[in-house]
């Protein structure tokens, strides 16, 4: 029997607790949800909230959607003088039309949930540059730029010009809302050739040398440069990410480098972490976000100590950016998309090609810990949006009917809204969890399946959609298998954040799998099956729409 949990609007009236291998896991407010998730953040006084302004049918309720066109890479996240968190992303408002090209679009937030549109901050095709691509900003609070006030914000970005990928600079005097060309509209760095990969500058200040540092994506390496004035840059090394440094398997084209530090309170150790976008095609994966643990030399060069690891194991967490919240915590937001199919032929309900698509991920909270002799970055989803219409059930394979395949037992089959929080606690009735547990998210135009092997610590994710056609469809519907190394346990916990066009899966031990699902259906069916004598305790709640 399914039980409805009576809740009031904007409040959560219950908390379901399970003890898993010594960790307290909460279905609402879990280790995968920030502890503040039960607070009433829906009373935010943000104005002009536009989380649901995508009008082509692909809008999401619980994620930020671009107001028009096509969005991709997330740019620097910084805290402004107005006490808001500001970020930019690449927007092509003329997607698949004339005057095609990206520019920096500006949004801000106070709670990492509700976002306010502020408009285009760095426009394309002006001031000597062409389309505006990825980069980062530097707040001049220490007066490094002597010709600019300490309140200035300086943006460095790549522009794809007719002669190659060049780095430009611009400055803002109004908290990042508008930018003016710096260095007389001339590039501060130029690619040596039209073909050279030379982009996505990440700038930061090196306290040891009193120089400004720049990390650049250069094909299979991250180039490292320094400057005493922010205009003239000197090469001082590189972090190689080719096959010879990665045990024979490269990571394809490197993009969007970033650098953050993490302190592990257990070992009392601080490490620097190089974050970047790459292609895991040689590792049974696709493009995604990666990290590498290491340290900095005094001159600002990054030195790797471990091999790269996948930050988010899903297909659609790319062009991510990061905010250093504290020595132990970094927040991250990614673009929910993939260059292999996001620009393919995606269809609206009327059969016409969609020219308006794109959303951001939920915020990830990152921390570092030591496991099996090496340091790993763990992620948890932050979702403080209000929950309503709770549903709780506990089912056992012993008393459940046989699934249509004649083999699995159907533990749960329920119709819900597409924007949904799903907490699943699995246990075996006699011993450790065994066999396969399958979770299906079904919409009229989209299906996603997650097949968890509780004995081997692996899971496989498959999806299909009638909204995508052509070659991109084959790439979109390719299945991927992932190791989560969580096997032979008495308890197995899976937490899912579903929305109309996305699914984020939090596995035990801090692993997240994010994916885009192309759908315009506002409803879905949730099905949970088991191949053996497992039981499940499940809680499902509607996420309240972020818009007013």
Predicted regions and their residues:
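Compositionally biased, intrinsically disordered low-complexity segments
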Residues: 8, 20-23, 531
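Sec-dependent signal peptide cleavage junction
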Residues: 25-41
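Classical Sec-dependent N-terminal signal peptides that target proteins to the secretory pathway
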Residues: 13-28
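Bacterial Sec-dependent N-terminal signal peptides
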Residues: 1-17
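Carbohydrate-active catalytic/glycan-binding domains of CAZyme proteins
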Residues: 38-548
């Amino acid at each position: 029997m399914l039980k409805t949990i009576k809740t009031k609007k904007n409040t959560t009236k219950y908390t379901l607790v399970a003890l898993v291998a010594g960790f307290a896991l909460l279905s609402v407010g879990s280790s995968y949800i920030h502890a503040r998730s039960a607070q009433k953040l829906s009373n935010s006084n943000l104005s002009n909230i536009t989380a649901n302004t995508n009008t082509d049918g692909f809008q999401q309720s619980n994620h930020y959607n671009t107001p028009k066109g096509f969005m991709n890479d997330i740019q620097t996240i910084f805290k402004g003088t107005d006490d808001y968190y500001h970020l930019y992303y690449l927007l092509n408002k003329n997607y698949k039309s004339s005057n095609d090209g990206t520019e920096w679009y500006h949004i801000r937030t106070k709670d990492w949930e509700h976002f306010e549109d502020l408009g285009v901050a760095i426009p394309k095709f002006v001031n000597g540059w062409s389309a505006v691509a990825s980069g980062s900003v530097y707040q001049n609070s220490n007066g490094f730029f002597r010709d600019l006030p300490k309140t200035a914000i300086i943006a460095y970005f790549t522009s794809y010009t007719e002669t190659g990928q060049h780095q430009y600079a611009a400055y803002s005097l109004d908290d990042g809302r508008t930018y003016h060309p710096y260095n007389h509209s001339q590039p501060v760095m130029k690619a040596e050739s039209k073909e050279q990969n030379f982009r996505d500058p990440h700038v930061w200040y090196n306290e040891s040398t009193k120089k400004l540092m720049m990390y650049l994506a250069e094909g299979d390496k991250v180039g490292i440069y320094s400057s005493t004035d922010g205009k003239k840059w000197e090469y001082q090394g590189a972090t190689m990410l080719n096959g010879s440094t990665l045990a024979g398997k490269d990571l394809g084209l490197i993009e969007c480098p970033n650098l953050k530090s993490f302190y592990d309170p257990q070992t009392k150790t601080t490490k620097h972490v190089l974050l970047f976008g790459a292609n895991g095609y040689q590792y049974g994966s696709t493009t995604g976000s990666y990290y590498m643990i290491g340290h900095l030399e005094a001159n600002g060069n990054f030195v790797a100590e471990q091999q790269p690891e996948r930050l988010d194991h899903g297909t659609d967490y790319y062009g991510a950016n990061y905010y250093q919240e504290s020595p132990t915590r970094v927040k991250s937001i990614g673009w929910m998309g993939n260059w292999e199919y996001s620009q393919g032929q995606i269809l609206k309900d009327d059969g016409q090609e969609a020219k308006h698509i794109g959303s951001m991920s939920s915020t990830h909270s990152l921390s570092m810990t030591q496991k099996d002799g090496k340091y790993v970055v763990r992620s948890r989803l932050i979702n403080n949006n209000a929950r309503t219409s709770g549903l709780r059930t506990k089912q056992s394979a012993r008393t459940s009917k046989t699934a249509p395949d004649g083999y699995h037992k159907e533990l749960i089959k329920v119709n819900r809204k597409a924007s949904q929080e799903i907490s699943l606690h699995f246990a075996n009735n006699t011993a450790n969890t065994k066999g396969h547990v399958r979770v299906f998210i079904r919409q009229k135009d989209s299906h996603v399946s997650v097949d968890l092997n509780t004995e081997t610590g692996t899971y496989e994710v498959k999806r299909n959609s009638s909204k995508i056609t052509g070659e991109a469809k084959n790439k979109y519907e390719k299945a991927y298998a992932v190791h989560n190394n969580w096997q032979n346990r008495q308890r197995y916990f899976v937490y899912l954040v579903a929305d109309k066009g996305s699914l984020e899966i939090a596995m035990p031990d801090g692993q997240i799998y994010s994916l885009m699902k192309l759908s315009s259906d506002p409803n879905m069916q949730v099905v949970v099956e088991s191949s053996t004598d497992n039981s499940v305790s499940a809680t499902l709640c509607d996420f309240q729409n972020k818009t007013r």
